[in-house]
Amino acid sequence: MGDLGFLSKLLDQVQSHSTVIGKIWMTVLFLFRIMVLGAGAESVWGDEQSDFTCNTQQPGCENVCYDWTFPISHIRFWVLQIIFVSTPTLIYLGHAMHIIQQETKLRARLSSPGGSRLCKQPKYTNEQGKVKIKGNLLGSYLTQLVFKIIIEAAFIVGQYYLYGFIMVPMFPCSKKPCPFTVECYMSRPTEKTIFIIFMLVVACVSLLLNVIEVFYLICTRVRCGSRAHSHKITSAENPASLSSPRWPTVEDSLKQNKMNMELETSQSIGGSLDGAKEEKRLLSH
C-alpha cells in the first residue's frame, strides 16, 4: 500500500487548515483506513482469487465466475474510496495554500516603505500565519464537506450493491463457459466479513463526522452573525457608546448662533449702562 504514502503526506498538511472535527476526521482516515488497509488487507485478501475454487474442470469457468462475483477487488474498491473521498480535501488545501501565499505577499508589501498607504489588509490569516476559516475560504470548506458526504454515501451504497456486507462461503454460478450451475467457494469468509463490517463502520463514522462538521460551521456562522447584528442594534439605541465623535447638525449650529447673538447684545447693553453711571458720577462732583 505504498501508493498511499504521497496522499498521506498531503493530507497531513490539511490538519493546520481544518476545524477540530476536521482533525478528528483526518485521524479516523489515517488510523482506521489507510493504516489498517495497508497493514491487514493484503494478508486477509491476498488469497482472494487464488483460493476461489469451483466444482468443475471446465477451463475458464473459475475465472468467469470470479469476475462475475467480484467485479472489482475489495482492496482496490477501498483504495478508490479513500482517493475519491480525499480529493475534495486536497482541492480545499490548494485553495487555502493559495490564499496563504497571497496574504504573505500582502504582509510583505505592508511592511515595506510606503506600504501603510495600502487599503487592503490580510483577511484570512493572522500575524503567525494561522488560517481563519471565513468568507470565501468558509464557502470552499463547506463545499468540500458536501462533496465528501456525497462521495462517502455513494461508495457505501455501491459496496452494498456490488458485494453486500456479508461474505457468503458459497456462490452459485451459471455463466458461460460453465457447462451447468456450478458452486464456487471463497476461503476464510468469516474473517473477510469482519473486515468488511469494520471498513463499513469506519466509512459511516467518517460520513457522520462530515455531517456534524457542516452543522457546526453553519451554527458558528449564524451565532457570529447574530452577535454582530445585536451589537449594531445596541450601538444604535445608545449613541453615546459609539467611539466616533458626534458631528453637529444644522439645527445645532442655528441654536449656537442665536445664543452667541443674545450674549453679545446683553454685553453691549451692560457696557452702555456702566458708561452712563460713570458719566453721572463725574458730573455730580
UniProtKB/Swiss-Prot annotation:
Residues 275-285 have a biased composition (Basic and acidic residues). The chain crosses the membrane at residues 20-40, 77-99, 149-171, 195-217. The keyword Cell membrane applies. Induction: In ovaries, hormonally induced at the onset of oocyte maturation. InterPro entries: Connexin, Connexin_CCC, Connexin_CS, Connexin_N, Connexin_N_sf. Residues 41-76, 172-194 are extracellular. It is found in: Cell membrane; Cell junction, Gap junction. GO terms for molecular function: gap junction channel activity. One of its GO terms (cellular component) is connexin complex. Belongs to the connexin family. Beta-type (group I) subfamily. This is Gap junction Cx32.2 protein. It comes from Micropogonias undulatus (Atlantic croaker).
